Amino acid sequence: MNLIASVYIKDNKVVKVKSGDFRTLKFYHESPIDLIKRFEDLGVKDIYFVDLGSAKMYEKNNFILLEMLSQFSSIKINYSGGLRTSEKVSSAFINGADKVTLGSMPVYDKNIFLNCLTTWGFKKIVMAVDIWKNSLRINGWKHQTKIDPLDHIDYFSNKGLKNIKVTDISKDGTLDGPPFSLYKKILKKYPQMNMITGGGIRNIKDIEKLKDIGIKNVIFGRAFYEENITLNELENYLKK
């Protein structure tokens, strides 16, 4: 089981929102670098860096902070938010991202997304499958499509896609528990996929249950920031 720390950034601070709603935005840390160092000391190997301003507000990508985080830590960074062109994807990698997660691009321009897969490699590109009421949402979860998530995965799976990040938006940042049945359904249909799951984690028991159903990559965030998962619990779990 690979535990991935969720680090949402707005105005160079660590924040979290519930189900993508900016009205619920809550600040947690003034210094992203100090937080990353803390995760590194605990044994976390990967972070999911969400550039929230770029994703939802069309602000300039915070590549300066991305570069700083990559220089001050050995943690691998999966960067997401506002990467709507191949040039921005390239800039993310140049500035220290180990992976990038793309959600809007595969919907708006399949050919550019497929070109990203072949240019940077299938291991470095993750497709976001962000679900609200059984359909995809894109553009920082602001635009509801009529696209069926499984049809979306089908198309790119047939093109060689290896990595997906699946989020039930209604669960994200809520501490309401993960959508276990959704994950089981996708695991069963796409056993070859490397699936990253995120949203709803309440405690260590949720993480253990996800492992039991076959999930290998779990993003956690609010449960740690709100101390539902303690430092000792996280450190002990990472040592297993």
Where are these regions (language model features)?
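Hydrophobic faces of well-ordered beta-strands that scaffold small-molecule active sites
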Residues: 3-9, 47-49, 77-81, 100-102, ...
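Conserved anion-binding
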Residues: 10-24, 90, 97-172
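Short, acidic/polar
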Residues: 28-40, 85-90, 144-155, 207
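Glycine-rich, proline-tolerant flexible connector loops at the mouths of alpha/beta enzymes
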Residues: 46-64, 104, 165-176
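Glycine/small-residue-rich loop that forms an oxyanion/phosphate-binding "nest" at active or ligand-binding sites
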Residues: 53, 61-118
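Charged helix-capping and loop-helix junction motifs
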Residues: 60-67, 142-151, 176-184
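Catalytic cores of alpha/beta
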Residues: 73, 77-99, 182-217
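Glycine-rich phosphate-binding active-site loops on the catalytic face of alpha/beta enzymes
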Residues: 91-112, 168-171, 199-203, 213-233
